[in-house]
């Protein structure tokens, strides 16, 4: 962040802020994740994703699926979001 950005109050992009938050959550939870127990943060993550996406697109809660699985030494966070078909543009 540059000096002028600091003075002028330029904000970070929403996507980069969300990415940083997700990385922090994953790093924190990674150390405490044991076995196949579902982490406590997944329902909150799903609700927050729903809130953010609903600002731009009309979707249902069932359209977002969040799943965490462990593969060998890796943990994979799988997020599937089903977006509606775009509305046809009006003919001129």
From Swiss-Prot:
GO annotation (BP), single: regulation of division septum assembly
Pfam families documented for this protein: MinE
UniProt-listed NCBIfam families: minE, PRK00296.1, PRK13989.1
Domain of life, per lineage: Bacteria
Protein name, per record: Cell division topological specificity factor
Role noted for this protein: Prevents the cell division inhibition by proteins MinC and MinD at internal division sites while permitting inhibition at polar sites. This ensures cell division at the proper site by restricting the formation of a division septum at the midpoint of the long axis of the cell.
Signal peptide (from-to): none
Sequence similarity: Belongs to the MinE family.
Alphabetical list of Gene3D superfamilies matching this protein: Cell division topological specificity factor MinE
Keyword vocabulary terms for this entry: Cell cycle, Cell division
Disulfide bonds: none
Gene: minE
Tagged with keyword Ligase: no
Protein's UniProt keywords contain Cell division: yes
């Amino acid at each position: 962040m540059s000096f002028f950005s600091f003075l002028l109050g330029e904000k970070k992009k929403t996507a980069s802020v969300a990415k940083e938050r997700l990385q922090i959550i994953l790093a924190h939870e990674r150390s405490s994740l044991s076995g196949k127990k579902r982490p406590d943060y997944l329902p909150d993550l799903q609700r927050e994703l729903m809130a953010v996406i609903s600002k731009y697109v009309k979707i249902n809660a069932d359209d977002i699926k969040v799943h965490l699985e462990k593969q060998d030494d890796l943990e994979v966070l799988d997020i599937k979001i089903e977006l509606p078909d775009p509305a046809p543009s009006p003919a001129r």
